[in-house]
C-alpha cells in the first residue's frame, strides 16, 4: 500500500469510530475540524474531573501545537453550545494524539509501519482478540502483525483485517519517539516553508 496523498489524508474516513453520545458529538464537531484543516482522531466522554469531553485531533500533516489545541477549542465550543448534546456541565479538553497514538485510519498503519503496536478485534482472529507486535505490511484490506511473543503453536505473523478492529494504538519505544519527533519536525518545516511561499506570492500580487 503506497503512501497516501495530502488530499486523500484530509478526506480519509476513520476505521474506528464512536457510538452513542460520543458519536453524536463527533458528528457535530468533525465538519468544523475539517474546515480548519484538522482531522478528528477520537472523541471520548469521561468522568475525570467531574465530566470531561476529550477531543483528540491533529492537522492533516500529523502535527499539533498548543496553539492549535486552543484554536480548536475556541471553534468547537460555540457549536457544542448551540447543538447542546450534553445535558450536564462539562470540561472541554482538546489534545494531540500523542506519540503512542490511537490508530484509527489506514494511513496511520502505513505511516507507522515497522513500529510496535497493540490492538483488539471485535471477532476472533487466529484464535484470539488481543494482539501485540510490529506492523510488517499494510494493504487495502488490513495489515500483518509480527507478534513479539507468540504462544506455542502460533504463527509469528498474523493478518488482521481492518473491518475486525475495535481498538488499536502504538506502543511507546525509543525508536517510535525518535521517528515521531523527526516526522513532526519535518512536517512543521514543510508547513513553514509553504506559508512563506504563500506570503511571497501575496507580496508579488
From Swiss-Prot:
Pfam families: DUF150_C, RimP_N. It is found in: Cytoplasm. One of its GO terms (cellular component) is cytosol. The keyword Zinc does not apply. Keywords: Cytoplasm, Ribosome biogenesis. Gene3D superfamilies: Ribosome maturation factor RimP, C-terminal domain (2.30.30.180), RimP-like superfamily, N-terminal (3.30.300.70). InterPro entries: Ribosome_maturation_RimP, RimP_C, RimP_C_sf, RimP_N, RimP_N_sf. SUPFAM superfamilies: YhbC-like, C-terminal domain, YhbC-like, N-terminal domain. GO terms for biological process: ribosomal small subunit assembly; translation. Coiled coil: none annotated. HAMAP family: RimP. PANTHER family: RIBOSOME MATURATION FACTOR RIMP. Belongs to the RimP family. Required for maturation of 30S ribosomal subunits. This is Ribosome maturation factor RimP. It comes from Sinorhizobium fredii (strain NBRC 101917 / NGR234). The gene is rimP.
Amino acid at each position: 500500500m503506497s503512501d497516501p496523498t495530502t488530499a486523500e489524508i484530509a478526506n480519509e474516513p476513520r476505521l474506528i469510530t464512536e457510538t452513542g453520545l460520543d458519536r453524536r458529538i463527533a458528528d457535530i464537531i468533525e465538519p468544523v475540524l475539517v474546515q480548519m484543516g484538522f482531522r478528528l482522531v477520537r472523541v471520548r466522554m469521561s468522568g475525570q474531573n467531574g465530566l470531561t469531553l476529550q477531543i483528540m485531533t491533529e492537522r492533516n500533516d500529523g502535527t499539533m501545537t498548543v496553539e492549535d489545541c486552543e484554536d480548536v477549542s475556541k471553534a468547537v465550543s460555540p457549536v457544542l453550545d448551540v447543538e447542546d448534546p450534553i445535558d450536564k456541565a462539562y470540561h472541554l479538553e482538546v489534545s494531540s494524539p500523542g506519540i503512542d497514538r490511537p490508530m484509527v485510519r489506514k494511513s496511520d498503519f502505513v505511516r507507522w509501519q515497522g513500529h510496535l503496536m497493540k490492538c483488539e478485534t471485535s471477532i476472533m482472529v487466529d484464535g484470539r482478540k488481543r494482539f501485540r507486535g510490529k506492523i510488517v505490511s499494510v494493504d487495502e484490506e488490513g495489515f500483518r502483525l509480527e507478534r513479539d511473543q507468540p504462544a506455542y503453536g502460533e504463527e509469528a505473523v498474523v493478518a488482521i483485517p481492518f473491518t475486525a478492529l475495535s481498538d488499536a494504538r502504538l506502543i511507546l519505544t525509543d525508536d517510535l519517539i525518535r521517528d515521531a519527533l523527526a516526522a513532526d519536525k519535518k512536517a512543521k518545516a514543510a508547513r513553514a516553508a509553504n506559508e512563506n511561499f504563500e506570503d511571497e506570492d501575496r507580496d508579488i500580487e
